[in-house]
C-alpha cells in the first residue's frame, strides 16, 4: 500500500508517494482560489506517474493521506479571515491583558467588535454586547475573560446566556468559543490571541479540509484516513485538529525532516533554510531535534506558549526584482505560480529571481519541474533588461548577478539572525537547504555564511512532504497550574494528570487507535515567569496518573527545580503510523559524461561549464565547480572553489574543494 503526503505551499503544492521502497516526488501549481484543486491535482498526477488508469484506481492502493499546508498562515498573512467578535473583561479592550495595545486590534479584529463586560455581568450586559457584535456582522464570538483559567465558570455562564437566547437552530446564531477551552493556559493574553487566531482562520481551513474529504469519498470512493499536519510535527484527523494548530505546519514538517536527517548523519547542530516561490524559512536543529521556543511571536502575534522556532524572509523564486535608489531590491511582491516569472510565458512581465537564475545559465529550460514546463530564456532576459539592467545602467548579465546576490544577502542575513537567536555560530552548524529553490542557493549561502558543509537533498523540492511522511499521529494537551512542589502537590496535581491522560486516550480511541500502543511524553514547566521556564520530562507507556507522577517526581529531583513555581503540565501522545524513512542508496546507474552550458558565477565573462545530470550520478561521484547539477528533483549550482559529492543516501554534500 502507498502513503501519500501532500504539502500545500503558497506557490507550489508538493506530494510524496511511497510504498516504503520507492518514492515519487510530484509538484503542481497551488490553486489559492480552491486548494482542493491542487490537492486533487497531486493525486491525479500520481495516478498518471504510476500507470493507473484513474485516480480512483490509484487511491484503491493508498492506505493513508497526510496533508500539511500554509493555508492558515496565508489567511493570517493576507488578512482575509472571518469577522470575529471578542467579549473581554472591561478595561482590556485595547491591550487584551497586555501592557500596550495588542497588535491584533485593528488587524485580526475590528476595535468596534471588542466588547468589555463588567466583572459580574448581567444577562442584559451580555446580550447587549452580543447584539452589537451581530449587528457588526461577526461570524464567531470569543469569550476571553481575565483570570478565567483554571476556573472558567464565568466564561461558561456567559456562553450559556448567549446560547439560551440564540440557540443553534435559529437564523443569526453564531458559534461561541471560550478562550479557556481553546488555550487552557494561565496567561490571559495568550488565551485571547490563540482563540482569536483560531476563530479568524477556522472557516477557510475547514472549507478546504472538508471539501477534500468529500472529494475523496464522493468522487474517488476512498474512505481511508485523511490526516492533517499540525505544528507539533505530528498529524491528526480533521475532527481533532484546531485551525490554530496548523499554522506553518508545512514548513515545520521540513524542519522535522531536517532533524531526521541530522540524526541519520550524526550532526548535532544544523541551520535549515527552505526556499519556496514566495518566502524563505529558517529553523534550527539542536542535538538532533527541532528547536522550540517558549514565548515569542507566532505570525507576529505575541503568545506565551511552546512552538517550533521558525523565522522568515520574503524572498523566493517568484520574488519581483526592481530598482530603487540605484540598487536592486527583491520582493515582497511575488508573481506566484500564475502568471509566474516572465520565463513561464504565461503573461508575467516582471523580472523575478527565477528569471535571473535562468539567465545566468543555472536552470535547464527544457527540464524545469522534470520537463513538465518549458522555460523561455528570451522572455527572462527581456524582463531583466527592461526592469533592472536599463534602470541600473548595466549589462543584462551584471543585472542578473545583482538579483542573485541580493537574494543570497537576504537569505544569509536571515540565517545569521536565526543562528544568533539560537546562540550558535556558523562554525558550530551544518547547513541544510531544501524547498523548490533551496539547493539553488546552498553553496552561495554556505560560502557567505561561513559554514563548513552544506547539504541538499534528492527529495529537497518536496522536503516538507518528506517530513510528513515520517510523522506520527500526535496530540498535545496542556494545562496551566499555579502550584508549589511540596508535600501537598501530589493531591493537587494528580487530577490534572488524570484529566490529560483521559483526554488523550479518548481522542486516540475516537480515531480508531489503541491507546495502549501509543507513547506518552509528560512535561512540567517550572519558572518564576511565563517567559523563563525550565521543563522536565518523562516518557512512558500508557500508565496510571500515580505512576506518571512518580516518574515526574524523579525528573524534578534530578533537574533541581523543585524550589521554583510549577506553571504548567503538558502531555504529548504519539501513535506510530505508516512512516517511511530514508534508506541508503544501493543502485548504480550508467555513468554519463557531463554536458556543458554557458554560465556566469561572478563578474567575469560567461564560460562553458560542466552540466551534470543528477539522475546519472552515483554514490561517491564528485562534481567540482564551476558547474551545475541539473535533475528533475535537484538543481544545484557549484561555484568556483566548491565541490558536490553524492553521499550514501543519494543526497548532495557541498564543501570547499580541496
From Swiss-Prot:
Disulfide bridge positions per record: none
Induction comment: By ethylbenzene, toluene and acetophenone.
Listed GO biological process terms: glutathione metabolic process
Pfam families for the chain: Hydant_A_N (PF05378), Hydantoinase_A (PF01968)
Keyword Ligase included in the entry's annotation: yes
GO CC terms, sorted: cytosol
Catalytic activity line of the entry: acetophenone + hydrogencarbonate + 2 ATP + H2O = 3-oxo-3-phenylpropanoate + 2 ADP + 2 phosphate + 2 H(+)
One annotated GO molecular function: ATP binding
Keywords per UniProt: ATP-binding, Cytoplasm, Ligase, Nucleotide-binding
Regulation: Inhibited by zinc ions, carbamoylphosphate and beta,gamma-imido-ATP.
Documented EC number(s): 6.4.1.8
Compartment(s) where it occurs, according to its Swiss-Prot or TrEMBL record: Cytoplasm
Domain of life: Bacteria
Main location (coarse class): cytoplasm
Cofactor note: Divalent metal cations. Magnesium or manganese are required for activity.
UniProt family annotation: Belongs to the oxoprolinase family.
Self-association state and partner proteins as the record states: Acetophenone carboxylase consists of five subunits; a heterooctameric subcomplex of two alpha (Apc1), two beta (Apc2), two gamma (Apc3) and two delta (Apc4) subunits assembles with the epsilon (Apc5) subunit in an unknown stoichiometry.
PANTHER family listed in its UniProt record: 5-OXOPROLINASE RELATED, HYPOTHETICAL 5-OXOPROLINASE (EUROFUNG)-RELATED
Protein name (database record): Acetophenone carboxylase alpha subunit
Amino acid at each position: 500500500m502507498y502513503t501519500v503526503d501532500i504539502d500545500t505551499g503558497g506557490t507550489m503544492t508538493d506530494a510524496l508517494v511511497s510504498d516504503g521502497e520507492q518514492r515519487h516526488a510530484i509538484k503542481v501549481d497551488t490553486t489559492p482560489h480552491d486548494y482542493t484543486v491542487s490537492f486533487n491535482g497531486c493525486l491525479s498526477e500520481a495516478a498518471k506517474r504510476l500507470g493507473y488508469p484513474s485516480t480512483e484506481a490509484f487511491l484503491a492502493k493508498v492506505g493513508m493521506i497526510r496533508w500539511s499546508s500554509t493555508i492558515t498562515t496565508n489567511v493570517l498573512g493576507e488578512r482575509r479571515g472571518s469577522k470575529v467578535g471578542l467579549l473581554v473583561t472591561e478595561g482590556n479592550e485595547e491591550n487584551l491583558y497586555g501592557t500596550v495595545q495588542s497588535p491584533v486590534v485593528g488587524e485580526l479584529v475590528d476595535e468596534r467588535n471588542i466588547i468589555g463586560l463588567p466583572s459580574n455581568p448581567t444577562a442584559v450586559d451580555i446580550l447587549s454586547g452580543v447584539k452589537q457584535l451581530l449587528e457588526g456582522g461577526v461570524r464567531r464570538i470569543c469569550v476571553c475573560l481575565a483570570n478565567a483559567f483554571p476556573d472558567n465558570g464565568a466564561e461558561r455562564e456567559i456562553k450559556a446566556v448567549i446560547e439560551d437566547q440564540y440557540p443553534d437552530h435559529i437564523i443569526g446564531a453564531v458559534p461561541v468559543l471560550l478562550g479557556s477551552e481553546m488555550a487552557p493556559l494561565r496567561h490571559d493574553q495568550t488565551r485571547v490571541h490563540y482563540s482569536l487566531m483560531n476563530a479568524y482562520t477556522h472557516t477557510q481551513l475547514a472549507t478546504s479540509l472538508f471539501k477534500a474529504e468529500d472529494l475523496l469519498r464522493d468522487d474517488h470512493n476512498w474512505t481511508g484516513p485523511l490526516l492533517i499536519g499540525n505544528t507539533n510535527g505530528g498529524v491528526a484527523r480533521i475532527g481533532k485538529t484546531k485551525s490554530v494548530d496548523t499554522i506553518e505546519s508545512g514548513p515545520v514538517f521540513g524542519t522535522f525532516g531536517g532533524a531526521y536527517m541530522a540524526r541519520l548523519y550524526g550532526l548535532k547542530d544544523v541551520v535549515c533554510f527552505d526556499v519556496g516561490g514566495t518566502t524563505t524559512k529558517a529553523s534550527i536543529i539542536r542535538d538532533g531535534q527541532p528547536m522550540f521556543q517558549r514565548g515569542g511571536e507566532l505570525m507576529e502575534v505575541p503568545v506565551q506558549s511552546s512552538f517550533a522556532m521558525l523565522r522568515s524572509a520574503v524572498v523566493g523564486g517568484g520574488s519581483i526584482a526592481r530598482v530603487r535608489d540605484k540598487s536592486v531590491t527583491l520582493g515582497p511582491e511575488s508573481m506566484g505560480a500564475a502568471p509566474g516569472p516572465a520565463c513561464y510565458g504565461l503573461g508575467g512581465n516582471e523580472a523575478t529571481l527565477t528569471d535571473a537564475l535562468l539567465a545566468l545559465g543555472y536552470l535547464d529550460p527544457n527540464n524545469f519541474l522534470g520537463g513538465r514546463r518549458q522555460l523561455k530564456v528570451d522572455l527572462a532576459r527581456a524582463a531583466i533588461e527592461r526592469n533592472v539592467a536599463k534602470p541600473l545602467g548595466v549589462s543584462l548579465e551584471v543585472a542578473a548577478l545583482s538579483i542573485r546576490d541580493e537574494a543570497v544577502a537576504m537569505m544569509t542575513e536571515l540565517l545569521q539572525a536565526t543562528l544568533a537567536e539560537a546562540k550558535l555560530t556558523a562554525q558550530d552548524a551544518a547547513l541544510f537547504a531544501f524547498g523548490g529553490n533551496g539547493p539553488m542557493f546552498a553553496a552561495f549561502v554556505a560560502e557567505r555564511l561561513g559554514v563548513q558543509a552544506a547539504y541538499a537533498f534528492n527529495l529537497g523540492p518536496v522536503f516538507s512532504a518528506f517530513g510528513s511522511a515520517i510523522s506520527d499521529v500526535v496530540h498535545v494537551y496542556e494545562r496551566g497550574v499555579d502550584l508549589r512542589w511540596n508535600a501537598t502537590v501530589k493531591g493537587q496535581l494528580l487530577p490534572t494528570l488524570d484529566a490529560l491522560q483521559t483526554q488523550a486516550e479518548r481522542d486516540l480511541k475516537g480515531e480508531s487507535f489503541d491507546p495502549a500502543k501509543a507513547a506518552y511524553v509528560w512535561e512540567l514547566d517550572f519558572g518564576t515567569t511565563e517567559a523563563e521556564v525550565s521543563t522536565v520530562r518523562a516518557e512512558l507507556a500508557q500508565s496510571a496518573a500515580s505512576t506518571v507522577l512518580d516518574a515526574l517526581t524523579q525528573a524534578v529531583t534530578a533537574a533541581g527545580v523543585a524550589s521554583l513555581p510549577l506553571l504548567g503540565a503538558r502531555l504529548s501522545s504519539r501513535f506510530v503510523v505508516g512512516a517511511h524513512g530514508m534508506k541508503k542508496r544501493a543502485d548504480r546507474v550508467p555513468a554519463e559524461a557531463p554536458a556543458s552550458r554557458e554560465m556566469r558565477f561572478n563578474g567575469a565573462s560567461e564560460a562553458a561549464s560542466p552540466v551534470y545530470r543528477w539522475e546519472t550520478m552515483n554514490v561517491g561521484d564528485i562534481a567540482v565547480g564551476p558547474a551545475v547539477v541539473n535533475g528533475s528533483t535537484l538543481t544545484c549550482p557549484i561555484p568556483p572553489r566548491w565541490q558536490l559529492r553524492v553521499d550514501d543516501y543519494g543526497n548532495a554534500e557541498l564543501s570547499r574543494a580541496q
